[in-house]
Every structure is written in C-alpha cells, then in structure tokens.
Design a protein with these regions (language model features):
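The structured alpha-helical core of multi-pass membrane proteins
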Residues: 1-393
Length: 393
C-alpha cells in the first residue's frame, strides 16, 4: 500500500510538471507567481490599492501647490524651475519607493510580515540600542497618522474654492473650508468605534477609479506640452536644486518628499495584502502618479505668464488644470481618496500601538475588536488623541 501511494504521488507530481512545461515561459512565470509569498490574486490586488496606496495617491493634491508657494507664485515657475522640480519628484519616487521599498525592503520580511517592528524583530539580537531607531520609526508613523488626515482632506476641500458655483460663498466665508474639513475629520474618527470593515471592502475599487482619474487628467494636459518629459533627465533636478532660480534652496526637498508620502505602506502592509499583489499593482500606481505630476507641470508651463493665474493666491495646479465641469468630479473623488488614505493610517496606528504594547514600550490600553475580523483593532485612547491632534493641525 505504501509503494502504491508513493507511485500515485509520483504520477501526480509528474502530471503537474508536464502541465507547467506545456504552458511555455509565460505560463511557468505565472505559475510561480501563484505560489508562495509572491502569489497574485485579482481580489487582493484590488484590496491592496485601498490599503497600501491611499496616502501616496493624495500627494498630487498638494505637492505642486506647495512648490509654487515656496517659489513665490506661478510667475516664478519658468521652464527651468518646472522641469527641475518634476525631475526631483520623479527620481525621488523612483529611488525611495521603487528601489528602496519595492526592490530592497520588501525582500526583508519577518515570516511574510513587514513594518518597522517586524524589521526590529529581525535585528534586535544585534544590540539593545536598535530599539531606539525602531521607536523613532514608530513615532514617525504615528505623526503621519495625524498629518495625513489634516493635509489630505483640507487640500481636497480647498478644491471647492475653484468651482464657479461656490467661489462667491468661500470668498465671503474665509473659515468655511476649515469648518468643512473639521466636520469630515470628526465624522471619520467617530465611526472608528463601529468598525469600518463593510465600507473598507469598497476602498480598493474607489482608489482604482482615483488613480485612473489622475492618469487621464494628467495625460490630457500633457498633450499640450510633451517636451515636459525632458524632466526624466536627472540633470534638470540637480541643476535646479543648486540654481539661483530655486527660491527655496535645499529646503525644496521637503516639498519634493511630499510626493513620496505613504511610501512606507508598501512595506508595512506587505503582510496584509501579500508581496506579489504589491509587485503587481505598483507599476500602474507609479505611471498614474507620474502622468499626473507631469500633467500639472505641462499646465504650469502653458500658463506661467497668464496674468489671471499670476494674481491667484494659493494657486493649486491640480484643480486648475481641469475644466470646471471636471473639477466637480475631482473634488468628490479627492475628498473620498483623502478619507481612504486617512483611514488606512488610523487603522495602522491602532495596530502599531498594539504591537508596541506587546513589546512593553507603551502602557497596556483598552483594545476593542468592532469587526468580525480580529485583526481590525480599535483603541479608544489612541483614536481620541489622534483626532484632537489632527484638529489642532
């Protein structure tokens, strides 16, 4: 009976090998992706969009606006400045996100898990002092959980000011943007205790629509100024960084790094969605981001001498590069994308505090599980502290 069983197993293994061999090189490559930690599944790939890329997906809302504010307005955004900042943005996304996280960090996992504390668990045996950078990394993530809701949601709500139907209303009520932002933030934190499992399932599809929208509007503006792709040459970025045209000096890198906000989620959420699904979705995300940033750059080069825009305070190329009718869609999508990005970080903050508690780095706090999935946590004290801090920001 043992020999018969071994023979049957050998036949099954041979049949599998024959099946894989018959698929050809592409089929064999796809079979490898369907096994182990690199497995790709369409459903989890959609989930990865909502969990991993929400934060970095809202960066186009405010990165170029911050650049213009630092340079003194659109009048100072000449060809050298625009190509320079686009080059810095492109290569920052490439080096920090693609090279650092996708190609290097994601290979260093702790039994499939990623994140600062998972990395610490791998290296803690080399010295107790390594707890210090791990704590600093965790603290930086918690700070991001405060800043992201404030910046992303407020930048999205500011898009209402560019709509003709609401322009007069916001001009007469200067604090209206702040009040709407505060209301959305309060609603976001108030629903945490009830669990977000149901709406969380739709996050991936919404983020897919959002990135597709970014790519389309960026491409539409690129058709007016294709030469903006000269910024792919890193020489433009280095030259502008040390140029007299750069009013912000080296501090402009603070603006440039806004484009990589949330890149750490590719590593920290690797255990939730799978390494293969991140590998599979990242090329689409990067292309959409590059098209959107370069589309904004093309719009700036087309309008840098337009007196109507030069006099506009706090000009945001993201909304201005669209027609008024498209802006309505952009505002709705950007607000939803901002909420999704905030939700991912809030959930991540709960998980990180729980992990820090297990390491005895924080006092033991009350933890609730409002959803059927035990991995989804809710810590009332953390929720309240982040909410108040976000409102102050």
């Amino acid at each position: 009976q043992v020999l018969i069983k071994q023979h049957e197993e050998q036949q099954q293994e041979a049949a599998k090998l024959d099946q894989v061999a018959s698929k050809g090189p592409v089929g064999r490559w796809w079979s490898r992706l369907q096994s182990g930690p690199n497995r790709i599944t369409p459903a989890m790939a959609i989930v990865a969009l909502g969990v991993v890329y929400g934060d970095i997906g809202t960066s186009p809302l405010y990165t170029m606006q911050t650049f213009l504010n630092g340079q003194g307005g659109l009048a100072h955004a000449d060809r050298e400045a625009v190509l320079g900042v686009l080059s810095l943005v492109f290569w920052s996304i490439t080096l920090i996100t693609t090279v650092k996280y996708v190609l290097i960090a994601m290979r260093i996992d702790n039994k499939g898990e990623g994140g600062i504390f998972a990395l610490y668990s791998l290296v803690r045996k080399y010295g107790a002092w390594l707890a210090i950078p791990a704590m600093l990394g965790g603290a930086a993530f918690l700070a991001d959980s405060v800043l992201t809701p404030a910046v992303s949601i407020s930048s999205a709500v500011e898009g209402l000011e560019t709509l003709p139907a609401f322009e007069k209303l916001f001009t007469e009520n200067k604090q209206l943007t702040l009040m709407i932002t505060a209301a959305i933030i309060l609603m976001l934190f108030s629903v945490q205790s009830r669990g977000t499992e149901r709406i969380g399932k739709a996050f991936g599809s919404v983020v897919l629509v959002w990135f597709s929208f970014l790519a389309v509007v960026g491409l539409a503006n690129l058709s007016q100024y294709w030469s903006v792709f000269a910024a792919l040459n890193p020489v433009y970025g280095v030259r502008f960084l040390f140029s007299s045209h750069n009013a912000a000096g080296l501090a402009i890198m603070g603006t440039v790094f806004l484009s990589t906000t949330g890149a750490e989620a590719l590593y920290s959420d690797m255990g939730h969605v799978g390494r293969g699904n991140i590998y599979f979705t990242w090329p689409f995300i990067k292309i959409a981001l590059v098209l959107c940033y370069f589309g904004q750059g093309a719009w700036m080069l087309n309008h840098w001498d337009d007196s109507a825009y030069i006099r506009t305070h706090g000009l945001n190329p993201f909304f201005e590069m669209m027609t008024p009718s498209v802006r309505y869609v952009a505002v709705v999508l950007s607000v939803v994308a901002g909420v999704i990005a905030s939700q991912a970080l809030i959930t991540g903050a709960f998980t990180m505090v729980s992990e820090a508690t297990h390491l005895n780095w924080m006092p033991h706090l009350q933890v609730r599980y409002p959803a059927r999935t035990r991995g989804l946590l809710y810590i009332p004290v953390v929720n309240a502290v982040i909410c108040v801090s976000t409102l102050f920001v």
